[in-house]
Amino acid sequence: MKKGVLLNSSISSVIARLGHTDKITIADAGLPIPSSVERIDLALTQGIPDFMSVLQTITHEMQVEAVMLAIEIKNINPLLFSEITRYLHLLEQQQKKPIEIIYVTHEEFKTQLPDNKAVIRTGECSPYANIVLFSGVTF
């Protein structure tokens, strides 16, 4: 049995194949996922699993160079926005490398989804609970 934090074999496989600047998205339950992108559906019911648990687990395995958020999250979901930015600051310290935060409109966010290696759907049901993770390098 795998000893690491991340046990999901599909997500582990995607992370293992990522190259520098490749992207994966962690999505809320409502984000439209293009059929051309690998969809890893973790959603069991509303709120399970929640967005932050999935983000924290994935970033235990993945080096993150940058993230993309919909600008709307700042005003429409400020509690989650604050939790995400606090966590990213902690992750920067753990990785000993900065993480750039890129803001786009929600419509722009959706247009870049076909370029992702995978979209991981959570059970999160709060607005704009979506993040693109850009793969970094560990050296």
Swiss-Prot record:
Q: Which InterPro entries match?
A: D-ribose_pyranase, RbsD-like_sf, RbsD_FucU
Q: Which residues form the active site?
A: H20
Write one Gene Ontology MF term: intramolecular lyase activity
Q: Does the keyword Transcription regulation apply?
A: no
GO terms (BP aspect): D-ribose catabolic process
List the record's Gene Ontology CC terms alphabetically.
Answer: cytosol
Q: Where in the cell is it found?
A: Cytoplasm
Question: Is Oxidoreductase tagged as a keyword?
Answer: no
Report which reactions are catalysed by this protein. beta-D-ribopyranose = beta-D-ribofuranose
Sorted alphabetically, the keyword list is:
Carbohydrate metabolism, Cytoplasm, Isomerase
Q: What are the EC numbers?
A: 5.4.99.62
Protein name as it appears in the record: D-ribose pyranase
Q: Which organism is it from?
A: Proteus mirabilis (strain HI4320)
